[in-house]
């Protein structure tokens, strides 16, 4: 049976002139969707555009939260697919999506290892520069005291990942989204807790997710993924 695969990304709160351009589609074995609040964003052939309405109490980071909602809840927005490949808008799919979903094997989800941090508490400390400090402290307190999340859980890179549309993956992403809505918008920090609480099966993708400079130019020396940026293993 043919896999039904959706490649999903989102872009909000950015001037279209400054946004990293979407890539031209290389593989026709998936459907491609971008959720955006930009009416005049240039969309290459083959992409399906969906309107995104950022509306959160956290006005400073509402665009981030809106995009994270798409990332985490693709199974609600696009329910008729077997698999979802998420990537931030600076990435592109450089391998046949059918091969990417095969890398899941028996797992519900698969992520790249985080290139720097080795625990969610360490990542949380780094998030202070890009988040409301009080919300950082509240997140740590709730995850540790209320949910007893161990300090040494691994941190995953969430720039790009692949997941199934099944009960375990959907529950994990639902909890992940609930944590994000109530706590920090830094989704790398709350993902380990969602995995721990739901016991979803998670695999590791080879390589690392892509990195970008502040001007949205991709830095080749920081780009080490083997499958999402078109390089070969």
Where are these regions (language model features)?
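N-terminal anchoring/stem segment of glycosyltransferases
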Residues: 1-67, 77-80, 182-186, 197-200, ...
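Residues that flank catalytic or metal-binding motifs in active/ligand-binding sites
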Residues: 3, 28, 71, 156-159
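A residue-level signal for conserved active-site and pocket-lining positions in enzyme catalytic cores
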Residues: 7, 32, 75, 90, ...
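Hydrophobic/aromatic beta-strand patches that form the interior of the parallel beta-sheet core
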Residues: 8, 33, 48-50, 85-87, ...
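Short His-Asn-centered micro-motif
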Residues: 8-11, 35-37, 87-89, 95, ...
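GT-A fold catalytic core of metal-dependent nucleotide-sugar glycosyltransferases
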Residues: 72-125
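Acidic, glycine-rich loop-and-strand cores that form catalytic or ligand-binding grooves
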Residues: 108-147, 151-152
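Catalytic core and acceptor-binding pocket of nucleotide-sugar-dependent glycosyltransferases
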Residues: 133-232
